Amino acid sequence: MRIPIIKYEIPIPENVKVSYENNILKVSGPKGEVERKFYHPLIKLSVNDNKIILETYFATRREKRLINTWRSHIKNMLEGVQNPFVYRLKVCYTHFPMRVKLEGNKLIVENFLGEKAPIIKELPYLDKVKVKIEQNKDETEIVVESPDKEKAGIVASMIEQSTRFLHKRKDRRRFTDGIWLYYKAGKNILEE
């Protein structure tokens, strides 16, 4: 069944600038800039009077799902340029002390499960994503921060996956060594 009109208005905050040209929506704010391509022949996106307007006529379920997805992406863009998304990963080891370094765009994990050869993982999007390694007394944390939620999530998952593939050979109840994501874009995963 077709829906005659679907129209959403998303308000733009005061300290955020938005422009839409050539199917690319650019959002810039005090903490950064994010851009994303939005194009569909049946969905119209426009920026008017401090509002982003999404509308479509005679939409099927597919267009309804797509317009709701676009609305979520735009809200994340508006939120990210004001308060960047933060992902926190913890370096855990029980058997062998593991060391983590960041050199350029490469993450180097040394002494993982006592192996001599280090694990080297190239990280994308480091021009738009900040990666910091914080070392306390006994704990090491990796903090990934970006106004773009998708790119921050990709980098955090690549860091987590860099030590995960070796767990196929080990019993995970006994070998908990690795880099584990515990804080994800404003939500503590351990409390859920």
Swiss-Prot record:
Gene Ontology CC entries for this record: cytosolic large ribosomal subunit
A family per Pfam: Ribosomal_L6
Disulfide bridge positions per record: none
Biological processes, Gene Ontology terms: cytoplasmic translation
InterPro entries named in the record: Ribosomal_uL6-like (IPR000702), Ribosomal_uL6-like_a/b-dom_sf (IPR036789), Ribosomal_uL6_a/b-dom (IPR020040), Ribosomal_uL6_arc (IPR019907)
Function as written in the Swiss-Prot or TrEMBL entry: This protein binds to the 23S rRNA, and is important in its secondary structure. It is located near the subunit interface in the base of the L7/L12 stalk, and near the tRNA binding site of the peptidyltransferase center.
Assembly: Part of the 50S ribosomal subunit.
Protein name: Large ribosomal subunit protein uL6
Protein's organism: Nanoarchaeum equitans (strain Kin4-M)
Lineage, uppermost ranks: Archaea, Nanobdellota, Candidatus Nanoarchaeia, Nanoarchaeales, Nanoarchaeaceae
Name of the gene: rpl6
